[in-house]
Swiss-Prot record:
Positions annotated as LRR repeat: 40-61, 64-86, 87-108, 116-138, 139-161, 162-184, 185-206, 208-229, 231-251
Superkingdom in the source lineage: Eukaryota
Lineage of source species: Eukaryota, Metazoa, Chordata, Craniata, Vertebrata
Gene expressing this chain: Lrrc58
Chain residue ranges for the region called Disordered: 337-356
Keyword Phosphoprotein attached: yes
Signal peptide: none
Pfam families: LRR_8
Protein name from the UniProt record: Leucine-rich repeat-containing protein 58
Residues annotated with Phosphoserine modification: S19
Annotated Gene3D superfamilies: Ribonuclease Inhibitor
Keywords: Leucine-rich repeat, Phosphoprotein, Repeat
Compositional bias (Low complexity): 337-346
Organism of this sequence: Mus musculus
């Protein structure tokens, strides 16, 4: 078999259109040669062949292997041979047929790979959920599962504390779990081409984040806490509804009598003690939120007005951020007295449409 070698520590058998059976004897011979050699095999490249399983010769023959590339094959499972590669740091298995039961070897979380594997690329496969064993690979720095069929991100993603790059674009994910914010080293987060409708404010805790890709989702706004991502250099939002759908669906329900009474107590600073009210009312009064409008000074509890406010970010972005106000009067300046109520109501929809279009041009679309 012809070999394209970039160095004594690498075997490059890419695009040879050979099967696992054809590779067996070659790998066994190489393993035998390496047992007495000074330099161990570090990189084995087997992409774009006709592999349906990992070659059995991998088992025990290459203990110092650091990189294994089996992308572009027809693998339906990564067999137990993988567990013998105790020094493996990078595993590339994109564009295969992985994703069914038994796709990953049993005992993966208890194997030496849990401590050695740093880069794992399983993009372009058929995973519908993140395998639990992957969430135990505590040394992972890069995890790629783009172009699969993932429906959600499990809360256990927070176990991957060393993760620096997470690529989950091109799936069917609807929600971002708040636990994602517990990854202190995360620099790159790619969640584009999914079905995400909102961004949890907890993401503002990702203080190391430099790049955030959210394009081609269903976002209508961003939480204002995103302004705390002071190291963010790249933000992609193109292909999202952003403000348009939010404005169309905006509704306001009047406060209940309970909330009106509680607002009065707070605004007028009416004093009370724990002996004056039952516990549930004391807790309710303690849940008041201050209206962010500096000219208002009011409070709200359960009932509020949602408002999109465009804020400059990093000196070059205009982001639509969500604000919560105590009443509709806080959401816009008073109308001019020179306009009649009829003409004002007739022009409202046109004004809102033009303002929204004007603002949308200033939003970063990636």
């Amino acid at each position: 078999m012809e070999e394209a070698a970039l160095g004594e520590a690498e075997l490059n058998w890419s695009r040879l259109s050979v099967s696992a059976e054809a590779l067996e004897s070659e790998l066994e011979a190489r393993a035998e040669e390496r047992r007495g050699a000074r330099e161990a095999l570090l990189r084995l490249l087997l992409p774009y062949n006709r592999l349906t399983s990992l070659p059995r010769a991998l088992g025990g023959g290459f203990p110092h292997l650091q990189l294994l590339d089996v992308s572009g094959n027809s693998l339906t499972a990564l067999g137990p041979e993988l567990l013998t590669l105790s020094g493996l740091r990078t595993l590339l298995a994109r564009n295969n047929r992985l994703g069914g039961p038994g796709s990953l070897p049993k005992g993966l979380a208890q194997s030496p790979l849990c401590r050695s594997l740093q880069v794992l690329n399983l993009s372009g496969n058929c995973f519908q959920e993140l395998p639990a064993s992957l969430l135990e690979l505590r040394a992972l720095q890069t995890l790629s599962l783009g172009g699969n069929q993932l429906q959600s991100i499990p809360a256990e993603i927070e176990n991957l504390r060393s993760l620096e790059c997470l690529y989950l674009g091109g799936n069917f994910i609807k929600e971002i779990p708040p636990e994602l914010a517990n990854l202190p080293s995360l620099n790159y987060l790619v969640l584009c081409d999914n079905k995400i409708q909102s961004v949890p404010p907890q993401l503002s805790q990702l203080h190391s984040l430099r790049s955030l890709s959210l394009h081609n989702n269903l976002l209508t706004y961003l939480p204002r806490e995103i302004l705390n991502l002071i190291h963010l250099e790249e933000l992609s939002l193109r292909g999202n509804p952003l403000v348009v759908r939010f404005v169309r669906d905006l509704t306001y329900d009047p406060p209940t009598l309970l909330e009106l009474a509680a607002r009065t107590i707070k605004i007028r600073s009416i004093s009370y003690t724990p002996y004056d009210l039952p516990g549930n009312l004391l807790r309710y009064l303690g849940s008041a939120s201050n209206c962010p409008n500096p000219k208002c000074g009011g409070v709200y509890f359960d009932c509020c007005v949602r408002q999109i406010k465009f804020v400059d970010f990093c000196g070059k972005y205009r982001l639509p951020l969500m604000h919560y106000l105590c009443s509709p009067e806080c959401s816009s300046p008073c109308s001019s007295a020179s306009h009649s109520s009829t003409s004002q109501s007739e022009s409202d929809s046109e004004d809102e449409a033009s303002v929204a279009a004007h603002r949308m041009q200033k939003v970063l679309l990636g």
